[in-house]
């Protein structure tokens, strides 16, 4: 940028080197993940979709042998779902058409299907497959729920091996430490990280979301030439 002094240029060069190193380290971690050995064979868990049962094995479509499941946190009898989970899924919805070109992808939750579907409709999740767990077995198997029914956000990957489905990878967010954990799955924090103030104490909320989506739908898209 014109006008930058030497101190800025030197600091920016150090940052550039660190950014390159970070990208390389991310790939090292991704390679370690890809090289995980075969996980255990899992039961053919049952879910509910539009009132009908569907099995885990039936979620593998076409020739795609990999399935990614995001498990949305829900507290029994609560009117709303986890705002952070909903934030992640807002982003997934926008790129679902791209994700499903390569892997199978669904959203699951312990919530009753009608409540889950209504929540998805209120958020504009029109590109995602939503499933309700049929009982606690699946959530507890992936550590998305403990024995007392306390939920935890979870993303889990399965791989179909002939007629068997195997567990491949599971991860949970770490929201107590500046939202690190599965934040790589959302652009929100990365945009904050580009700013001088960083992430600060920001925390996702469901408040105001309906008004925002109504405004966005009502406003035309303006294209600006640069």
List where the protein language model places each region:
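Thiol-based oxidoreductase modules, predominantly thioredoxin-like and allied folds used
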Residues: 47, 96-115, 126-137
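Non-globular targeting/processing and membrane-anchoring segments
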Residues: 1-97, 101, 121-122, 136-226
